[in-house]
Amino acid sequence: MQDGYILYFDSGTTNTRAYLLNADLEVCHVIRRGIGSKDSAISGSNKVLVDCLCDMYQRMLEENHLSGDSIKRIYASGMVTSPYGLHEVPHLTVPLDIRKFAESLYRFHESSGIGRDIWLIPGLKTDRDDFSFAGNMRGEEIEIIGAMDELKKLGIHDAALVLPGSHTHIAYVKNDTVADIVSNFTGELFHALKSETVLAPVMDCVPEALDEDMIRLGADNCRRFGFNRAIYICHAMRIMNKYLPEQRFAYCEGVVNGGLGQILEYYLRNIWSDCKTVVLISDEFMYKLLSVIVSETCGELVRDVIWLRADRQTSYSVGGLKRIINVTGEKQ
């Protein structure tokens, strides 16, 4: 193996991935662990996460027959920059172009195990007088930078990027600049309803296909009646034995995610009026779900809905890191 490697940690709330990139910035090895900032928060210390990163570092060296000197630089993104991460780093403020972002990485010396400098990639936030428009992210920013390169290949330079997750973030990007962010509760809300409410039997369903009409009904009821009433209707469906289990499930998804359509419609109509393209960065399930909601709520405002597949085999975070390295010219 050729020397001149880069190690990149992508650490979230519940999982951490370590990527080994060669001198040509090609991924040659990946290690995954089910530990993230949540484990640090629960324990009251970041030691569990630091130990995880140190262990992954040693494993990466051993499994690839490398010495520490073979790793020329280490980067980390995501929740490692949060209070329960590796080291808290303040968010950068949008609008921010890729060059300024790449020049704003935070150099941190990890002394307890790895014993090296790690370049931490900050999150992003908005800064407006009206706090109702607040948005912030940690980890999604580097995915956005990676996705922007993919969109360039499609001739797209101006789009609203939707990144579903525990918190679904929508970022408006234009000409290599992250211009705005709007952040929302979604996946975490779904989990709470599934684990802590009487809707658990409805949401435990695993349908073979999503019923698009029921998604639309859920989203429409959320718009007409508000979340509280719309989600109760799903409970009533089960009590009164109305509709099939998979239809109730699709309805629930429409309610939980229907607000995203309303939020996106508001921003496209009132704030991002030049934007005519929506990009869904997700797995196939979320693409099918959100494409129905976007078409239903934003149809007259959107010209194209684009899908960028994101799964275990596709990492836009790695693509974002490559872009940062190429911008700064610091491979070594």
Regions found by a protein language model. Give the residues of each.
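Short glycine-rich, Thr/Ser-proximal phosphate-binding strand/loop in the N-terminal lobe
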Residues: 6-48
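A short acidic Gly-Thr/Ser loop motif
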Residues: 9-15, 79, 162-167, 186, ...
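Glycine-rich phosphate-binding loops at beta-strand->alpha-helix junctions
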Residues: 15, 274-293
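Glycine-rich phosphate-binding loop plus the immediately following alpha-helix
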Residues: 36-44, 125-160, 164-224
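Phosphate/pyrophosphate-binding loops at sites that engage ATP/ADP/AMP, CoA/4′-phosphopantetheine
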Residues: 54-73, 261-274
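Short beta-strand-loop/turn "lid" adjacent to the catalytic site in phosphate-handling enzymes
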Residues: 63-108, 114, 119-134
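Adenine-nucleotide phosphate-binding core of ATP-dependent small-molecule kinases
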Residues: 220-263
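Glycine-rich phosphate-binding/hydrolytic loop that grips phosphoryl groups
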Residues: 255, 259, 306-332
